[in-house]
């Protein structure tokens, strides 16, 4: 699959490395072209780095691996995203990571859909720490990625990506369910960083 990763932070780098390693065609876009190029070179597997618009132009799926506050500028830089799958992996959290800045009546994925009304926005990967994106870091455990979106075809593409790097993609319903998934992501941050569990934790829905 042709995937653009927008952002060179821990989540962007982790997803880019995992997806490129799984055989996907990965392009990395960032405002800092040198960082994008350096990350692509480090990852290898044919990954390329450049500006945001160039990365998006050659991709079918675009991963917005950015803080929620940076989304508007990134989408403006992306150019035409009509018909493309936009994966929102963000949690709209405060600077101290301790609370959501929006939620329940609106949510990050909905605001991104407003910014890109012709794109197919899907919420996913927001409950996974960057340290668990590399398949070997999970030590054989299969973690779940909750996938919410309004287009079944878009969700299927995201599930395929998740499966290709060793996750279990779980259909979490329409995009509006992101308002429930985002608090799960925030709770995971609390478990990891404020309750002493560390970043090797992730929520899993178990049917009994």
Annotate each predicted stretch with a short phrase.
Residues 49, 120-125, 169-172:
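General beta-strand structural signal in soluble alpha/beta enzymes
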Residues 1-45:
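NAD(P)+-binding Rossmann beta1-loop-alpha1 motif at the extreme N-terminus of oxidoreductases
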Residues 23, 59-60, 119:
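Short, well-ordered alpha-helix to beta-strand connector turns
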Residues 143-208:
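Active-site-lining helix/loop region of Rossmann-like oxidoreductase modules
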Residues 44-46, 52-96:
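Rossmann-like NAD(P)-binding element
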Residues 90-137:
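Rossmann-fold NAD(P)-binding glycine/threonine-rich loop
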